[in-house]
């Protein structure tokens, strides 16, 4: 999908996008990616089980829990800004809506996973899958915003 976005011509805009949007979408990609890596580390090392039981690997779990705040706030900001521009730029609004829906689903599944202490494996896998979908959506959004915001380079004739 990202390759297809890169090959398509940039979408036309009635108004330019805010100058800060490419940087903000990039920050969202980086924070969600970092959070996904921490989540993968928690799952692969069974850090939650070891922390709840033997009080080992608690630092890994705590870093993942602390990372929820910045990743959620940046993704929420990107989704909200994109959704608010829906009348001017419909594709941006649709992607913003997808980000917000996936973010709400991710937080809900994450809370349920934590409350059940990662004992329900399909729920843990769903948490990882929704995180990957959120990351992919943010990557596509970032690519489109960056391509759309590029100013044409003046040529000397």
Per-range role (PLM):
Residues 1-157:
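Polytopic transmembrane helical bundles with strong interfacial aromatic enrichment
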């Amino acid at each position: 999908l990202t390759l297809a976005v890169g090959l398509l011509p940039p979408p036309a805009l009635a108004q330019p996008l805010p100058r800060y949007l490419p940087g903000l979408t990039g920050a969202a990609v980086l924070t969600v990616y970092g959070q996904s890596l921490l989540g993968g580390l928690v799952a692969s090392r069974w850090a939650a089980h070891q922390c709840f039981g033997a009080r080992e690997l608690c630092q890994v779990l705590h870093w993942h829990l602390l990372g929820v705040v910045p990743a959620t706030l940046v993704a929420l900001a990107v989704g909200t800004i994109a959704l608010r521009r829906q009348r001017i730029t419909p594709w941006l609004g649709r992607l913003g809506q997808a980000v917000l829906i996936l973010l709400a689903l991710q937080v809900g599944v994450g809370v349920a996973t934590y409350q059940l202490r990662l004992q329900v494996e399909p729920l843990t896998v769903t948490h990882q899958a929704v995180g990957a979908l959120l990351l992919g959506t943010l990557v596509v959004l970032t690519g489109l915003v960056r391509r759309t915001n590029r100013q044409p380079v003046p040529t000397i004739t």
